[in-house]
Amino acid sequence: MNINFNNINLIISAVKKAQYPDTGLTEVALSGRSNVGKSTFINSMIGRKNMARTSQQPGKTQTLNFYNIDEQLIFVDVPGYGYAKVSKVQREKFGKMIEEYITQRENLKLVIQLVDLRHQPTEDDVLMYNYLKHFDIPTLVICTKEDKIAKGKVQKHIKRIKDKLELESGDNIISYSSIKNSKQQEIWNFIETYI
């Protein structure tokens, strides 16, 4: 895939179906727990520091943010789940917004579910992964923050995540460091198979 990383922009921040952009391009959604590093992942994949706003404070992304990647595909940054300080009403609102997008959006071809390599997946991670599998939505699990784990222990942590999510053979998982941009090309190659 030959992407001009200077030609990337945020099209819209949407909260309902009527606001989704009509581009006809393939969409890749990024899902994960609050503060798992979705925005940092987007920025590192497109070689920008601040295209997707990052925050130390969980729960900052509250809309579906559609990023046009060089007129070739759209990254959709989805609100993080599992943040305890968000009210129950707000969590339900996010849940409905995400469910509507994931189950009804024809342009959606792949979901990248991010999990923190340092920790065992939460029940929310397991629920989201099972939800995606239930609807037969192609999913790539990215284990973020690989640089925070000693190199010799990475495979052990990946196995723990595979076991908790009950990944089967043929399910896809890649560990990644946004600092080192490790395996960036492997991830782009995977995404390209859905475009």
Curated annotation (Swiss-Prot):
A molecular function (GO) term: metal ion binding
Binding site for Mg(2+): S39, T61
Ranges for domain EngB-type G: 24-195
Residues involved in GTP binding: 32-39, 59-63, 77-80, 144-147, 176-178
Database matches in Pfam families: MMR_HSR1
InterPro entries for this protein: G_ENGB_dom (IPR030393), GTP-bd (IPR006073), GTP-bd_ribosome_bio_YsxC (IPR019987), P-loop_NTPase (IPR027417), Small_GTP-bd (IPR005225)
Keyword Cytoplasm: no
CC annotations in GO: cytosol
Keyword line: Cell cycle, Cell division, GTP-binding, Magnesium, Metal-binding, Nucleotide-binding, Septation
Cofactor(s) needed for function: Mg(2+)
GO biological process terms on file: division septum assembly
Family: Belongs to the TRAFAC class TrmE-Era-EngA-EngB-Septin-like GTPase superfamily. EngB GTPase family.
NCBIfam families: GTPase_YsxC, small_GTP
Function recorded in the entry: Necessary for normal cell division and for the maintenance of normal septation.
Name of this protein: Probable GTP-binding protein EngB
Lineage: Bacteria, Bacillati, Bacillota, Bacilli, Bacillales
